[in-house]
Amino acid sequence: MFNKVVLVGNLTRDIEMRYAQSGSAIGASAIAVTRRFTANGEKREETCFIDISFYGRTAEVANQYLTKGSKVLIEGRLRFEQWSDQNGQNRSKHSIQVENMEMLGNSNAPQQGGNFGNNSFSNNNYSGNYENQSYDPYMSENQNFNKAKANPAPQRNQSPQHEEKLKEIDIDAYDSDDTNLPF
């Protein structure tokens, strides 16, 4: 099964860092994602708050450069977490395990921690295996996918006139309402 999530939003709190017994960094935070739309001629907003977790070097970079309110693009996978609370009640939630992130600078606001502009960072196939993690039935599938990504098929030489150029997307240009979307 395909499990990929891409979100752009702002952190709702600073990164909370922990370290596994193996020394691997684990970072936790949450992201607020706002959807703007028009309903019955009235402009409305709907904000969703999602817990996110970073692992390895990505956690360290996120902790160093991101603070509450930082705008970030994250790419990762959806996880379903289950536990028992102090009263013995079964609890659950969905969260995102971040695999790649891009720090998005906001030109309208001063940035804390230095001007990092638009920078991306990847876990470099870090699997997030740390102590007390339950069995992940998709891990072998993800490892095979990561091996395929690490060893891409050879590509033919193409002349520059046939290469597609990726255009940068101004995310803020799409924040007005759904009628401006290109699809």
UniProtKB/Swiss-Prot annotation:
Compositional bias (Basic and acidic residues): 161-170
Single GO BP term: DNA replication
Segments for region (Disordered): 108-183
Low complexity bias: start-end ranges: 111-135
Keywords: DNA-binding
The keyword DNA-binding is assigned to this record: yes
Domain SSB: 1-105
GO molecular function, one term: single-stranded DNA binding
Compositionally biased intervals (Acidic residues): 171-183
GO cellular component: nucleoid
Source organism, top-level taxon: Bacteria
UniProt xrefs under Gene3D superfamilies: Nucleic acid-binding proteins
Pfam family, any one: SSB
Coiled-coil portions: none
InterPro entries per record: NA-bd_OB-fold, Primosome_PriB/ssb, ssDNA-bd
SUPFAM superfamilies named among the record's database cross-references: Nucleic acid-binding proteins (SSF50249)
HAMAP family the UniProt entry points to: SSB
Quaternary structure annotation from Swiss-Prot or TrEMBL: Homotetramer.
Protein name according to UniProt: Single-stranded DNA-binding protein
Source organism per UniProt: Campylobacter jejuni subsp. jejuni serotype O:2 (strain ATCC 700819 / NCTC 11168)
